[in-house]
Amino acid sequence: MSSSPSTQQFKQRLDEHHQWPCTYMFKFIVPLQQTQKILDLFESRDELHTRPSRYGRYMSVTARCTVSSSDEVVAVYQAAAQVQGVISL
């Protein structure tokens, strides 16, 4: 599977700013009904925090976990993109 130019640029920037393995923070905003799908991406990860929005329609999900490469970071974002309504921050 080939990566898009924007994915390649993102991976290059990650490699320039991180030494692997390292702790990386993922942050998502997701409709409340889809929260578990995002949580499932991080079931064996180091640290996971959730916080509901003011009116309870959305959930903020923050995960800090050890990743071994920019490819692993991109894979998480690509998996999260499959969740309907997710916003990756």
Language-model regions: role of each:
Residues M1-S60, T66-L89:
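Long, contiguous binding/interaction regions
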